[in-house]
């Protein structure tokens, strides 16, 4: 395959998972946790080939002896040295490519500080010597993946949730809303409410166990109060989970209390609106003429929208907020966990997109600020 040589790379750097692969593919080749782990103890056995840091799945599998750190918090890179390690791992270990031979499409959350994308640009050109790169907004890519050009995307990942109205392919920046409440906060909340049940989860490694419980057993209730009553009166909602050491724990109303925080952030002690209200507020910030199209094309994307029951609940909540005659449609594609990456794969392989890349030459002439002019 001669094209493989120049295929663009698409890297969706999430706060929780990094999704990477080649433009034109229908799914990412590599999906691994955005984690860098460092040993908690001194190595005592010489010749074991111990490293001073581990990335991704390897960090995850050795988590018992490591301190795990996520370099991306709420969609913003907070530790650039670790971020470089993740990119290095992506290119050389996961995709096994030479970054100086491929254009690279990166993604970022909307309303990110400008310095964040400048630094991304700088590292790609100066550290990895990529021939060309581009930074795209995550939610816009999700809409591409759903085959639409108009709609509102409610994208919720591990670090940040945002609602982005898009009309005829243009994101409407004044109406984008961002909520720093996402998967990681729900994991922390589940750790807290499991502690109330008498199970103790405290370390960074144990947090990963709780994340797994959350992903396997949690769901969104259509009617929270009613579900609480059901849970109190019978054990029909209880499920058990086996911990790595063989101990079995039982989880009941925590299953839906945890993701309920998306609709009631007050559970986490936050004063913000829930995801349904944020979506509604975002639509209300748009021109009155286009709202109908947004209500009818509300697209969910990101891993935190994977809970069973979330689409029905969104439908119910937004119907309650919107005018009574409005047609409301919540679109929850089955592949929405990866729809940002899929959208990036579509975008980077379009012939019309090829003139959009920032080239190494343009970067050398203008410096990192070129990214604001070419990527919008």
UniProtKB/Swiss-Prot annotation:
One of its GO terms (cellular component) is axon. It is found in: Cytoplasm, Cytoskeleton. The modification Methionine (R)-sulfoxide is found at residues 45, 48. It comes from Xenopus laevis (African clawed frog). SUPFAM superfamilies: Actin-like ATPase domain. Polymerization of globular actin (G-actin) leads to a structural filament (F-actin) in the form of a two-stranded helix. Each actin can bind to 4 others. Oxidation of Met-45 and Met-48 by MICALs (mical1, mical2 or mical3) to form methionine sulfoxide promotes actin filament depolymerization. Mical1 and mical2 produce the (R)-S-oxide form. The (R)-S-oxide form is reverted by msrb1 and msrb2, which promote actin repolymerization. GO terms for molecular function: ATP binding; hydrolase activity; protein kinase binding; structural constituent of postsynaptic actin cytoskeleton. It is an enzyme of class 3 (hydrolase). Its main location: cytoplasm. This is Actin, cytoplasmic type 5. Keywords: ATP-binding, Cytoplasm, Cytoskeleton, Hydrolase, Nucleotide-binding, Oxidation. Actins are highly conserved proteins that are involved in various types of cell motility and are ubiquitously expressed in all eukaryotic cells. Belongs to the actin family. It catalyses: ATP + H2O = ADP + phosphate + H(+). GO terms for biological process: axonogenesis; cell motility. Its EC number is 3.6.4.-.
